[in-house]
């Protein structure tokens, strides 16, 4: 999967089509300020949507709860297509925010700090906590 930010080029639809023509799956990355409507007419070209629930740049930031509504909106857009499009969330994912993301419609989570905090002896406990048990 090759994912691009809508803001990174002038023709998102052409970029997504080209990625797929070259044999890769295509993804779109949403920064916190990116509106979901930007992909409204190109859902057939998308295989993955990644919602950044923090402003990209460094780990350990707090989850932006305002992104839950965006996840819900994107889930509705995906469901309307009848296609399987992964909906992934990255940024501030913790044992507390993971269930909120899943309830909002996410199908995959990226967790860095929540997995690695406390060092290798804590990884298993941290992963269990993310899974809800």
Predicted regions and their residues:
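Conserved strand-to-helix beginnings and helix N-cap segments that scaffold or border functional pockets
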Residues: 13, 64, 99, 120-124
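Catalytic cores of alpha/beta
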Residues: 34-46, 91-109
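Conserved, mostly hydrophobic/aromatic
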Residues: 49, 74, 90, 101, ...
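Conserved anion-binding
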Residues: 1-86
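Short Gly/Pro-enriched loop/turn and capping motifs at secondary-structure junctions
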Residues: 55-57, 92-96, 115-116
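A short hydrophobic/small-residue beta-strand
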Residues: 1, 26, 108-109, 115
């Amino acid at each position: 999967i090759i994912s691009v930010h809508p803001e990174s080029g002038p023709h998102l639809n052409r970029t997504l089509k080209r990625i797929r023509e070259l044999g890769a799956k295509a993804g779109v990355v949403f920064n916190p300020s990116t509106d979901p409507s930007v992909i409204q007419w190109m859902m057939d070209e998308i295989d993955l949507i990644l919602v950044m629930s923090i402003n990209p740049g460094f780990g350990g930031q707090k989850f932006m709860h305002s992104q839950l509504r965006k996840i819900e909106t994107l889930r509705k857009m995906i469901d309307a297509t009848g296609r399987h499009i992964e909906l992934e969330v990255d940024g501030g994912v913790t044992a507390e925010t993971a269930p909120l993301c899943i309830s909002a419609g996410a199908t995959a989570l990226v967790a860095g700090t929540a997995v690695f905090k406390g060092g290798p002896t804590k990884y298993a406990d941290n992963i269990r906590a993310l899974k809800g048990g």
